[in-house]
Amino acid sequence: VTYKGKSIFDFGDVSTCSFHATKLFRTGEGGALFCNDTDLNHQMYFSHNFGHNGPLDFHGLGINGKISELQAAMGLAVLPYMGEILKSRKSVVDFYSDNLDFKKLTTIKIRENTVWNYSYYPILLASETILQKVQNALNEAKIFPRRYFYPSLNTIDFVKGASMPISESIASRVLCLPLYAGLTEEELLQITTIINQSLC
């Protein structure tokens, strides 16, 4: 993802990226940290390798944050196909955008000057009750949208108590539609038809 020609990984001190199996670029598990600060970058590097830089040079506490050879091989196998994957995912996003009833739901608006990676297609429904109706109708057809952003993080134990009414409202009403390379037009038509009919 870029904004005004600049990678989003260039904003802030440290950016993170997941390589989980559900992500655009995947290794099965793992992820990456991006940092433009040399000292901080060295500190993170040592932390991911038990605090070591080689067998005898110890810098402090650390974890085993390395991905396995198998996971690295998976990433290398996916990498040459990223252009095709992005093109296919864009066509899925375009189909959803052209065929969903936006009088009864909304989706994200991509800012001008943004190059997007088509990682998710979230829809925002009027209420959690309507979301559950749509989700149940899709599930009955063996289609499984996900609630990736539920529950609102302020409701989980270690941060419980913070008042975040907007987050709570949106988290309860966001549903992410199936989005992967290879979804057929027939499957997409089935998904959009079920959603639109559920909203009648």
Locate each region found by the language model:
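Adenylate-forming
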Residues: 27-30, 75
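Ser/Thr-centric signal marking residues that sit
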Residues: 22, 35, 184
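PLP-dependent aminotransferase class I/II
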Residues: 38-200
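Short, glycine/charged-enriched secondary-structure capping and boundary segments
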Residues: 4-8, 30-32, 161, 191-192
